[in-house]
From Swiss-Prot:
Signal peptide region: none
Record GO biological process: DNA repair-dependent chromatin remodeling; regulation of DNA-templated transcription
Listed Polar residues bias regions: 168-183, 195-210
Coiled-coil intervals: none
InterPro entries: ING_fam, ING_N_histone-binding, Zinc_finger_PHD-type_CS, Znf_FYVE_PHD, Znf_PHD, Znf_PHD-finger, Znf_RING/FYVE/PHD
Biased segments, Basic and acidic residues type: 211-223
Modification Phosphothreonine, positions: T183
UniProt key word Repressor: yes
Name of the protein this chain belongs to: Chromatin modification-related protein png2
């Protein structure tokens, strides 16, 4: 027998029932409040009439002024029970809404665990995200390309053949997290897989650690193996790629590093790192991966050739 939707999404159904129960729990209270208001309006009209008679103070009135005041006071006292009833009804309605909110808060975590992230967040609007490309000035792009070329030149001078051999041996033993970062030429030549469905914390470019605020770059990691100092300096980064807190911005969404991210294999990629939900991925793919901009650029270059 197949499993019904109620059994699959039990937490979601309970969450929906809590939302549906909000109008039912307060509708009766509000109806009673309207009925009390109607009764109070009738008494209010009687009070206004009594006040008018007292102010006129007619001599031929059947009741004296004191009797009229006592009668007015008695009428006013009739309103007090209605006021107490309205306070009780409003308090009950507030408590019912509060209990529904507490129920929603308690079940929200289970709903997130029950529904996959891809189904909850959906796929991003690629065209909307691509609008950022039009806001980047040619001068900014040229500065970034110049910075990348400078970094690659420094890296090629510092990374000797002996260090490449040592890094490759350490990568096979999986004993050192620093040995997992190689140049693209070295990785493809030795047929070392660049990505996997469940990569180690520091063994792949496509899975930076979620605890770090900024993904590790290839050139930066490799320089740490040689002299312990990062190659990329903060003063070489463009101001448009820095957040207000001074952190590097990545991806189409122009946010800081968080969660699981994937890196583009194009050395001249403008954004470098991308959040998996922003590119429509659930887990890092195997093999070489390019962002849509770099992929379209490569296709246009091939068509020209």
């Amino acid at each position: 027998m197949g499993t019904s939707g109620i059994e699959i999404f039990a937490a979601l159904n309970d969450f929906t029932d809590a939302i549906v129960s909000v109008p039912e729990s307060v509708c009766g209270k509000f109806t009673s409040l309207k009925e009390i208001d109607a009764q109070v309006r009738d008494i209010r009209q009687n009070v206004i009439q009594e006040i008018g008679v007292v102010l006129k103070n007619e001599k031929n009135d059947e009741l004296s002024g004191e009797e009229r005041c006592e009668r007015l006071q008695k009428t006013l006292k009739e309103i007090l029970p209605y006021s107490d009833s309205k306070i009780c009804l409003a308090t009950d309605a507030m408590n019912n809404i509060k209990s529904c909110i507490d129920r929603l808060d308690a079940g929200f975590e289970y709903v997130e665990l029950e529904i996959p992230q891809q189904l909850r967040l959906g796929y991003p609007d690629d065209r909307a995200l691509m609008n950022y490309h039009s806001t980047v000035t040619p001068q900014t792009s040229e500065r970034r390309r110049e910075t990348r070329r400078h970094q690659n030149n420094q890296h090629s001078q510092q990374y000797s053949s002996q260090e490449r051999s040592s890094s490759y041996n350490n990568f096979e033993d999986a004993s050192s997290p620093q040995s997992s970062y190689h140049t693209p030429t070295k990785r493809r030549k030795n047929a070392v897989p660049r990505k996997s469905s469940s990569p180690p914390l520091s063994s792949t470019k496509h899975a930076p650690q979620s605890t770090e605020r900024r993904p590790v770059r290839r050139s930066e990691s490799r320089l740490k193996q040689t002299n312990g100092e990062p190659l990329v300096k903060h003063d070489t980064l463009d101001s448009s790629d820095i957040s207000r807190e001074g952190e590097q911005l990545y991806c189409y969404c122009q946010q800081v590093s968080y969660g699981q991210m994937i890196g583009c294999d194009n050395e001249n990629c403008k954004r470098e790192w991308f959040h998996l939900p922003c590119v429509g991925l659930v887990e890092p793919p195997k093999g070489i991966w390019y962002c849509k901009e770099c992929e379209e650029l490569a296709k246009s270059s091939e068509s020209r050739q």
